[in-house]
Amino acid sequence: MLLPAPALRRALLSRPWTGAGLRWKHTSSLKVANEPVLAFTQGSPERDALQKALKDLKGRMEAIPCVVGDEEVWTSDVQYQVSPFNHGHKVAKFCYADKSLLNKAIEAALAARKEWDLKPIADRAQIFLKAADMLSGPRRAEILAKTMVGQGKTVIQAEIDAAAELIDFFRFNAKYAVELEGQQPISVPPSTNSTVYRGLEGFVAAISPFNFTAIGGNLAGAPALMGNVVLWKPSDTAMLASYAVYRILREAGLPPNIIQFVPADGPLFGDTVTSSEHLCGINFTGSVPTFKHLWKQVAQNLDRFHTFPRLAGECGGKNFHFVHRSADVESVVSGTLRSAFEYGGQKCSACSRLYVPHSLWPQIKGRLLEEHSRIKVGDPAEDFGTFFSAVIDAKSFARIKKWLEHARSSPSLTILAGGKCDDSVGYFVEPCIVESKDPQEPIMKEEIFGPVLSVYVYPDDKYKETLQLVDSTTSYGLTGAVFSQDKDVVQEATKVLRNAAGNFYINDKSTGSIVGQQPFGGARASGTNDKPGGPHYILRWTSPQVIKETHKPLGDWSYAYMQ
């Protein structure tokens, strides 16, 4: 693990060099590994701890304030977060920050910025490493239970998100930040050159989604690690878990005012931060229309900013599984069911369109329907046999229901399985498989963000044309997968689909990226592809300064050729 902060700091500040043209030597290294995903088998200690945490949350509502300037603040605009699978259970009571409070948060953040930016990276890294250790150990059951109850995740989906991925973000970002300090320019005597990785000048607005607790922690945490101050607007439907992450960071040693925790109405928050002259960045995950609107607001206000704001955004996708006739059928079926229906299809990377060759369709269809009948949808807190639970809220339920009604009425579409909806207790939608005769049907093109898988069956001899179709059908470019045992086909698909997916999988499902292994993100309408989880992501949140110090005075202003 990491050296103690004083020792690491000394190591970072003592980069020896000898001779012309040699780079500074990085004398310290932080070794980290991906957090193991726990199994939660019957009788295991992690399962017992989680069940106790779930029991403690049953019927309970937590009061969550805005936290501005190290002060807990309540406004009159009270909101509630309900459990998706039991909307009669209010899991959190919180309030929206008004414009005045948001401006106060900006002022408090700016007042803390210089001191935080000057803090050695080793000290900042230690805070996030401690938070990761807390999440890995004593706070694991709490964050999992709050993610399950508040966001409707099953135990494994909560585990790979709120525990493993969030822990990995904190640890790997710390590793990358420490190593970045060692990336220095060459020095040629009589001069010494160095780079200082400063935070951005101003504040960063972090706007996080409901579907991953880890994303919220990273959107706010990564800029803070790099010396920035942050206004964090968490999702209304992930408030319970987001506040737990914030509290853990504070308990791990994050000073007050570095991250302001400000639930707020989305448009008001966007208007307020983009009208501030001190905005220096927006770190966003959410919908394409919202990100475009924020981008336009920044452009309209460009003349007032002290610096050009950095915009990083991840906006979803219409992700594909392309199947060649040489594919392994069981791999296709299992991977597609997981990708399309885990967490109710509410992952940015979820498979939403499946392209199958005619020769394999009878076999794949039969296996999909057979396995579909075994999928259990229910209460993940009471029944650990649940594969996925309710969708996040009434708005999402209504949108998905509208798509299912479209599937029933369109002459080009046939519902093969599922598609029933029931919001009497929770926002439940059955996993639905739809076959489309038209590859350009809207259900094959537009993001649904629910448990709906659309299938197009193509002629075997048209696989190259179908690859072109996959590439051109949607405006997105987030994730995709190709299933084939033919290396030539894989090579062809990789070329044709080069820009169709920022995360491209061969004989594997389109979901499940792991920090440090598959940095995540896509281009086109899917976002700015800054690849959180990778070593380059933190560069978005630093403004490097290069310093040259000359050790031999310049004795004469004139040049030799002038003599």
Curated annotation (Swiss-Prot):
Organ and tissue specificity: Highest expression is found in liver followed by skeletal muscle, kidney, heart, brain, placenta, lung and pancreas.
**Residue positions, PTM Phosphoserine:** S44
Q: Is Cytoplasm among this UniProt entry's keywords?
A: no
EC number(s) recorded for this UniProt protein? 1.2.1.88
Keywords, sorted A to Z: Acetylation, Disease variant, Mitochondrion, NAD, Oxidoreductase, Phosphoprotein, Proline metabolism, Transit peptide
S-adenosyl-L-methionine as a keyword of this entry, yes or no, is no
Which N-terminal residues, if any, form the signal peptide? none
Cellular component terms per the entry's GO annotation = cytosol; mitochondrial matrix; mitochondrion
- InterPro entries, from UniProt? Ald_DH/histidinol_DH, Ald_DH_C, Ald_DH_CS_CYS, Ald_DH_CS_GLU, Ald_DH_N, Aldehyde_DH_dom, P5CDH/ALDH4A1
The transit peptide is at: 1-24
Q: What GO molecular-function term can you cite, just one?
A: aldehyde dehydrogenase (NAD+) activity
Top-level lineage group: Eukaryota
Q: Which residues form the active site?
A: E314 (proton acceptor), C348 (nucleophile)
Sequence similarity:
Belongs to the aldehyde dehydrogenase family.
What's its job?
Answer: Irreversible conversion of delta-1-pyrroline-5-carboxylate (P5C), derived either from proline or ornithine, to glutamate. This is a necessary step in the pathway interconnecting the urea and tricarboxylic acid cycles. The preferred substrate is glutamic gamma-semialdehyde, other substrates include succinic, glutaric and adipic semialdehydes.
Indicate the disease this protein is implicated in.
Hyperprolinemia 2: An inborn error of proline metabolism resulting in elevated plasma levels of proline and delta-1-pyrroline-5-carboxylate (P5C). The condition is considered to be benign, but affected individuals can exhibit neurological manifestations that vary in severity. Clinical signs include seizures, intellectual deficit and mild developmental delay.
Q: How does it assemble?
A: Homodimer.
Q: State the protein's name.
A: Delta-1-pyrroline-5-carboxylate dehydrogenase, mitochondrial
Q: Which organism is it from?
A: Homo sapiens (Human)
